[in-house]
Curated annotation (Swiss-Prot):
Assigned protein family: Belongs to the phosphoglycerate kinase family.
Protein name as it appears in the record: Phosphoglycerate kinase
Subunit structure, interactors included: Monomer.
Pfam name, any one: PGK
Native source organism of the sequence: Trichormus variabilis (strain ATCC 29413 / PCC 7937) (Anabaena variabilis)
Enzyme class: transferase
Length: 400
């Protein structure tokens, strides 16, 4: 799926033209309305700066939170302020995303100026992908750039609908990098390819596990979902989380791995807690010795060694989902050890891809984000791409 990119547009093509750029500025705020993490804003800078340097007039569209209609707390005003600081130029802010005020401010833009539209989700038509709303959004622009990978799995007006009215419709640098890493890892990886899948529920990762069993050489499973596999094997799991309706599925996934010659690794020991709390009493036991009344909240030290050995000779690793309840320091060791392991093997040329969601937070928590080859900015979008699904926001872009 090779898409036309913003890099392929020359200054001659776009100088003086109006670019509608879909970004993902859904950043966290504190109670005072200050941005606590501007990673997503920084991630969009390469695309914005490329367009301004080529003389385009840049119109940015983003969602912010989940408003039901206009919500004063979910205006993009703090984002405009932070973006102005990062770009070193004033960003024009509108109070709406369509209509006369927007048209007037866009008409006044000089080449290289940047304007930020108000939260597109103030209109319910955005998530319904309403063609009339998409047409109004597109009316102020000449061409379209999608640089919001995190919403690419949604067919919304600003991610999919507008492409019907604007040409060219191209991928921004962030989307291009996501596709380059995630797709090549699935379609054409350097082998051995290992996938590490964690998280609490098998049900949310079934699609990914099934797809990866077709593609990878080794599959490592951690997190709460391991107890569904253990119970399916007939082991006692105490009070650990189990999805009773997924026991047969767990058996069939193990059988499928065997049949395909994929090395499927589950932890050999676990760290147990007597209740779900950061200060719970804990003990480490082998998986055959889980007593009643205890629940597993992390993988144990032996499992870490087994996983490290399995990862030592890999050339590509995809990691999605933590090994335990890493929000509790007492049960974070397994997740942190995997992060350190990936940082180490990355130094010897292994491509390490963090596939969105909680694993990103885990890698950032231990300060190793800059040592990974690629950290995906999409949670659901990364998962769907790894599952081999078509993402509407990507499919709608022009072919290269």
């Amino acid at each position: 799926m090779s898409k036309k990119t913003v890099a392929s547009l020359s200054a001659a093509d776009i100088s003086g033209k109006r670019a509608l750029v879909r970004v993902d500025f859904n950043v966290p705020l504190d109670d005072q309305g200050n941005i606590t993490d501007d990673t997503r804003i920084r991630a969009a800078l390469p695309t914005i700066q490329d367009l301004t340097q080529k003389g385009a007039k840049v119109i940015l569209a983003s969602h912010f939170g989940r408003p039901k209609g206009v919500d004063e707390k979910l205006r993009l005003t703090p984002v405009a302020k932070r973006l102005s600081e990062l770009l070193g130029q004033e960003v024009v802010k509108t109070d709406d995303s369509i209509g006369d005020e927007v048209a007037a401010k866009v008409a006044a833009l000089q080449n290289g100026q940047v304007l930020l539209l108000e939260n597109v989700r103030f209109y319910k038509e955005e998530e319904k992908n309403d063609p009339e709303f998409a047409k109004k959004l597109a009316a102020n622009a000449d061409f379209y750039v999608n640089d919001a990978f995190g919403t690419a799995h949604r067919a919304h007006a600003s991610t999919e609908g507008v492409t019907k009215f604007l040409s060219p419709s191209v991928a921004g640098y962030l989307v291009e990098k996501e596709l380059q890493y995630l797709q090549s890892a699935i379609e054409n990886p350097q082998r051995p390819l290992a996938a590490i899948i964690g998280g609490s529920k098998v049900s949310s990762k079934i699609g990914v596990i099934e797809t990866l069993l077709e593609k990878c050489d080794k599959l490592i499973i951690g997190g709460g979902m391991i107890f569904t596999f253990y119970k399916a094997r007939g082991l006692n799991v105490g009070k650990s989380l189990v999805e009773e309706d997924k026991l047969e599925l767990a058996k069939s996934l193990e059988a499928k791995a065997k049949e395909r010659g994929v090395s499927l690794l589950l932890p050999t020991d676990v760290v147990l807690a007597d209740n779900f709390a950061p200060d719970a009493n804990s003990q480490t036991v082998s998986i055959d010795n889980i007593p009643d009344g205890w629940m597993g909240l992390d993988i144990g030290p032996d499992s870490v060694k087994v996983f490290q050995e399995a990862l030592a000779d890999t050339k590509t690793v995809i990691w999605n989902g933590p090994m335990g309840v890493f929000e509790f320091d007492k049960f974070a060791a397994g997740t942190e050890a995997i992060a350190h392991t990936l940082a180490e093997i990355g130094k010897t040329g292994t491509t390490t891809i963090i596939g969105g969601g909680d694993s990103v937070a885990a890698v950032e928590k231990v300060g190793l984000a800059d040592q990974m080859s690629h950290i995906s900015t999409g949670g659901g979008a990364s998962l769907e791409l790894l599952e081999g699904k078509v993402l509407p926001g990507i499919a709608a872009l022009d072919e290269a």
